[in-house]
Amino acid sequence: MKKIKEAEQRKIRRKKRIKDKIGRGIATRPRITIFKSNRYFYAQVIDDSKGHTVASISTIEKSLNLSKNIDDIKKLGEVLAKRLKEKNINNLIFDRNGYKYHGLIASFATSLREFGINI
């Protein structure tokens, strides 16, 4: 039980440290935030000045029919990059939401970069 609490505390500290560094998203450079559940992967692009979600994507979308593995997360990044290009958004602030930058998070970010989104 103690190890679980310590892991949660570390995640909370990482999350606070990240928020302090990246600041808030604006209309010209919105913030992309990530959430991972045990089954699904979610990403949403947020304009913090208005408090609106500009674009979002997840593995739960039936039209995409994707699972939570690295290959499908790369496809998810590709689809989100296309959606952002349609809305003329090329620059983002990447908020990894306290998750370590490896595995799914890293592959999602590199996928966005490969398709022309500056993070």
Curated annotation (Swiss-Prot):
Pfam families: Ribosomal_L18p (PF00861). The keyword rRNA-binding applies. Keywords: Ribonucleoprotein, Ribosomal protein, RNA-binding, rRNA-binding. GO terms for molecular function: 5S rRNA binding; structural constituent of ribosome. Disulfide bonds: none annotated. The keyword RNA-binding applies. Gene3D superfamilies: 3.30.420.100. One of its GO terms (biological process) is translation. GO terms for cellular component: cytosolic large ribosomal subunit. CDD domains: Ribosomal_L18_L5e (cd00432). This is one of the proteins that bind and probably mediate the attachment of the 5S RNA into the large ribosomal subunit, where it forms part of the central protuberance. Part of the 50S ribosomal subunit; part of the 5S rRNA/L5/L18/L25 subcomplex. Contacts the 5S and 23S rRNAs. NCBIfam families: L18_bact. Belongs to the universal ribosomal protein uL18 family. This is Large ribosomal subunit protein uL18. The lineage of its organism: Bacteria, Pseudomonadati, Spirochaetota, Spirochaetia, Spirochaetales. The gene is rplR.
